[in-house]
């Protein structure tokens, strides 16, 4: 699906600190409806901090976060998620004492897409591995299955934007390929997404636009072909 000009997320001039450490430096970032963004950069340069600033998990010292045109700076993660933003954090955060079925069903939220809604049945069709584990507790799943469950649970909210922080970190290659396949399906469904991952080759196969951060600022913004055609830039900013 081609992105539109409607901005679902608009962050302007963010300055976010951890104590005395200045992490985001006057950073601006947008997500349009239908857009898939690859958010990249070396470790510790502000990618997760940007996502947490958008989600209300960290409060910027200055700057503005608008979600679907509403001022949401400093609002709670719950309030942000109610506006259609789903967040899959690094570390997943599933409910280990609940079954796979319970993890999914507790997140269910009616959508507005009709037959294209992410229902319980559609999520299980997308993640057939979870069908085999419905009655297993979250803590009994492998790392890859937990990641599938976390993404499936996020889709059950029928979001407008899905944010994936370290989408395939620590996963076996076979499972990682399955996650990338699912990311492609999410793009085709029309949901906007922001994908953080170290595998720039896979990210750029899916993304419409790519943003590279360096020291809390945007160092590059452009299309996948532009990024892949510039090995010097990849080496400078990503070390590849």
Where do the language-model regions lie?
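Helix-to-loop junction immediately C-terminal to a conserved catalytic motif
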Residues: 55
């Amino acid at each position: 699906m081609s992105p539109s000009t409607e901005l679902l997320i608009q962050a302007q001039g963010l300055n976010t600190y951890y104590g005395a450490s200045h992490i985001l430096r006057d950073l601006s970032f947008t997500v349009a409806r239908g857009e898939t963004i690859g958010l990249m950069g070396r470790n510790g340069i502000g990618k997760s901090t940007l996502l947490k600033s958008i989600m209300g998990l960290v409060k910027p010292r200055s700057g503005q976060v608008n979600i679907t045109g509403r001022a949401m700076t400093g609002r709670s993660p719950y309030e942000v998620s109610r506006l259609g933003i789903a967040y899959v954090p690094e570390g997943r955060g599933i409910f280990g004492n609940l079954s796979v079925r319970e993890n999914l069903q507790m997140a269910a939220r009616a959508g507005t897409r009709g037959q294209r809604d992410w229902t319980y049945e559609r999520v299980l069709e997308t993640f057939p591995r979870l069908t085999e584990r419905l009655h297993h507790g979250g803590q009994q799943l492998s790392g890859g299955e937990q990641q599938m469950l976390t993404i499936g649970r996020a889709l059950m909210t029928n979001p407008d934007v899905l944010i994936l922080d370290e989408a395939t970190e620590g996963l076996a290659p076979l499972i990682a390929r399955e996650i990338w396949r699912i990311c492609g399906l999410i793009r085709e469904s029309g949901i906007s997404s922001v994908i953080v991952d170290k595998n720039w080759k896979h990210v750029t196969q899916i993304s419409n636009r790519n943003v590279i951060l360096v020291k809390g600022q945007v160092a590059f913004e452009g299309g996948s072909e532009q990024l892949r055609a510039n090995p010097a830039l990849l080496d400078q900013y990503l070390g590849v």
